[in-house]
Amino acid sequence: MGSPVHRVSLGDTWSRQMHPDIESERYMQSFDVERLTNILDGGAQNTALRRKVESIIHSYPEFSCKDNYFMTQNERYKAAMRRAFHIRLIARRLGWLEDGRELGYAYRALSGDVALNIHRVFVRALRSLGSEEQIAKWDPLCKNIQIIATYAQTELGHGTYLQGLETEATYDAATQEFVIHSPTLTATKWWPGDLGRSATHALVQAQLICSGARRGMHAFIVPIRSLQDHTPLPGIIIGDIGPKMDFDQTDNGFLQLNHVRVPRENMLSRFAQVLPDGTYVKLGTAQSNYLPMVVVRVELLSGEILPILQKACVIAMRYSVIRRQSRLRPSDPEAKVLDYQTQQQKLFPQLAISYAFHFLAVSLLEFFQHSYTAILNQDFSFLPELHALSTGMKAMMSEFCTQGAEMCRRACGGHGYSKLSGLPSLVTKLSASCTYEGENTVLYLQVARFLVKSYLQTQMSPGSTPQRSLSPSVAYLTAPDLARCPAQRAADFLCPELYTTAWAHVAVRLIKDSVQHLQTLTQSGADQHEAWNQTTVIHLQAAKVHCYYVTVKGFTEALEKLENEPAIQQVLKRLCDLHAIHGILTNSGDFLHDAFLSGAQVDMARTAYLDLLRLIRKDAILLTDAFDFTDQCLNSALGCYDGNVYERLFQWAQKSPTNTQENPAYEEYIRPLLQSWRSKL
């Protein structure tokens, strides 16, 4: 029998003391951290409410996530379902509204480690695509958990390309029913969360066939499991898709439908209807059915994707002031690794972009709320820009947050590879966001189509076609352009107008270049589809630069609103400057390409950038403290507020089942190996 690890009695003295190396970082504050937290929360009242909810959540042992790193897939699923169950009980007892802030704060406190998250997506889709009658019928059933619903769109053979979905919904006028069917193996619904074990109903996206004509993708409410004993209903083949990189708490599933019949009323009908005789009535645009995806993407940005990078920054920054390595001077003690410029270069751009993304997500949410109401009232004028912004920001944020979290993990050295650091799970969660709700390359190319259309609109002669005004996000396409950057010294690159103009210049050039390549191919005889395919790399580059411009512009506009907070405005401006200049240095070839920047100016930008690293260093811990994540929410041995990294890491390691159970390989393999060698000695 293998012996348990030797247990050292640490007591809890260390857990009541602040590590001096992190305490010193908080001693001299150049700005009010609490006030910045209030700004990030959208007001002091929201901060107070969030902390109240977090206090409630963390007071219940049912919500503990501390053993997550040692659990099996089944244990994670059951624990997540337990949390979902108890959240519903608390919400009902305390009167938390389904759309209120409290449930969002509870989700944040638990790091999203809760079951039935796709149930909420179903509700969003119902409210976006359903008629008032359908909402009145199904919404209360969802709210009271009389049914558990999922959103079944992605298939085994198709994902982001929605027009290629194979599941069919054929209308039978004789019975006034839709026959939902998976005609091929690749038509199997694959990946929907809550589908594998939990859901009783699914909102199935399928190709509508009525009166002999295919009408494109529409949404149908389909019962899939018995409400009596949870067994699959007739015609339903259903299960879990198996192991994944992460999200063990979520039962991602598969669904095959074999001529399953649902009533005519189960097709969501806000934007399209099928009359009893099979007549198809179109009430919206072809893009109307994409509205639920827009809703989900906007919510993902601030609710799912961005907080993960923020957590990674908190963990890596705190660990970097505790970890000491080598000496800056031979006579000095070992230095905090955050005092090394190379560590600052790894972490500060991630911190800067997390703030840039925060302010962008806030402005996008405001635009979405205004546009969403208009769309539900049949005003689709905002939809093109809303779609372009939501797809572009989802692609950019998931890409940069994934890269940023991985950079934070590596910046923590070997300990960053331990699950107990919390960082590996953050990285793998973010990795999924690069493909769920739209694969990023495809999303960038959807933005590119919007950019091409917008650019061509600027080239129309005033009298040819009635010109609608450009969308605000691409208004820079008609702004006066500078041929050369006017910067003459490093400090000039700290001017928001200068670097915003620089990003706009490069974006315009790349968009124009992509259009010209497209036109050259079509004029030489290529059809539009082939010409597009042959220029997608150029379009992709243009879309990415446009998205970066949007983040820079959004950050500068957010700073302008902080005139009454000079200390906070100053420290955030440094992050804004760093974000803009880091992007310029990373993509310097794009700025040098047409000599907009000279080599000497790139050197100036680098000088400004390196000086910003030095200035941000003194506020780094405070800027991450402002995110205000609880230790329970971070669930990291490296990132706790008190800085007692090594004590916590050692204590947590002792909880591993491998240290308390018998060695399963000792009797069968290790002992015989050792004895065989002894017999030869």
From Swiss-Prot:
EC number(s) given by UniProt: 1.17.99.3
A Pfam family it matches: ACOX
Superkingdom in the source lineage: Eukaryota
Position of sequence motif Microbody targeting signal: 679-681
Cellular compartments annotated: Peroxisome
Cofactor (UniProt): FAD
Keyword Flavoprotein: yes
GO annotation terms (biological process): bile acid biosynthetic process; fatty acid beta-oxidation using acyl-CoA oxidase; very long-chain fatty acid metabolic process
Modified residues (Phosphothreonine): 13
GO cellular component annotations of the record: cytosol; intracellular membrane-bounded organelle; peroxisomal matrix; peroxisome
Residues bearing the modification N6-succinyllysine: 66, 137, 453, 561
Keywords linked to the UniProt accession: Disease variant, FAD, Fatty acid metabolism, Flavoprotein, Lipid metabolism, Oxidoreductase, Peroxisome, Phosphoprotein
Enzymatic class: oxidoreductase
Reaction catalyzed: (25R)-3alpha,7alpha,12alpha-trihydroxy-5beta-cholestan-26-oyl-CoA + A + H2O = (24R,25R)-3alpha,7alpha,12alpha,24-tetrahydroxy-5beta-cholestan-26-oyl-CoA + AH2; (25S)-3alpha,7alpha,12alpha-trihydroxy-5beta-cholestan-26-oyl-CoA + O2 = (24E)-3alpha,7alpha,12alpha-trihydroxy-5beta-cholest-24-en-26-oyl-CoA + H2O2
InterPro entries: ACOX_C_alpha1, Acyl-CoA_ox_N, Acyl-CoA_Oxase/DH_mid-dom_sf, Acyl-CoA_oxidase, Acyl-CoA_oxidase_C, AcylCo_DH-like_C, AcylCoA_DH/ox_N_sf, AcylCoA_DH/oxidase_NM_dom_sf
Keyword Oxidoreductase: yes
Principal location listed in the UniProt entry: other
Effect of residue 225 to W: In CBAS6; reduces fatty acid beta-oxidation activity; does not alter subcellular location
GO MF term set: 3alpha,7alpha,12alpha-trihydroxy-5beta-cholestanoyl-CoA 24-hydroxylase activity; FAD binding; fatty acid binding; flavin adenine dinucleotide binding; palmitoyl-CoA oxidase activity; protein homodimerization activity
Residues modified as Phosphoserine: 3, 9
Expression tissues: Present in all tissues tested: heart, brain, placenta, lung, liver, skeletal muscle, kidney and pancreas. Most abundant in heart, liver and kidney.
Assembly and binders: Homodimer.
Disease: Congenital bile acid synthesis defect 6: An inborn error of bile acid synthesis characterized by abnormally increased liver enzymes, hypolipidemia and low cholesterol, vitamin D deficiency, elevated plasma and urinary levels of C27 intermediate bile acids 3alpha,7alpha-dihydroxy-5beta-cholestanoic acid (DHCA) and 3alpha,7alpha,12alpha-trihydroxy-5beta-cholestanoic acid (THCA). Serum levels of phytanic and pristanic acids are normal. Clinical features include liver fibrosis, mild ataxia, delayed development, and cognitive impairment.
Function: Oxidizes the CoA esters of the bile acid intermediates di- and tri-hydroxycholestanoic acids. Capable of oxidizing short as well as long chain 2-methyl branched fatty acids.
Family: Belongs to the acyl-CoA oxidase family.
Name this polypeptide is given: Peroxisomal acyl-coenzyme A oxidase 2
Taxonomic classification: Eukaryota, Metazoa, Chordata, Craniata, Vertebrata
Gene giving rise to this polypeptide: ACOX2
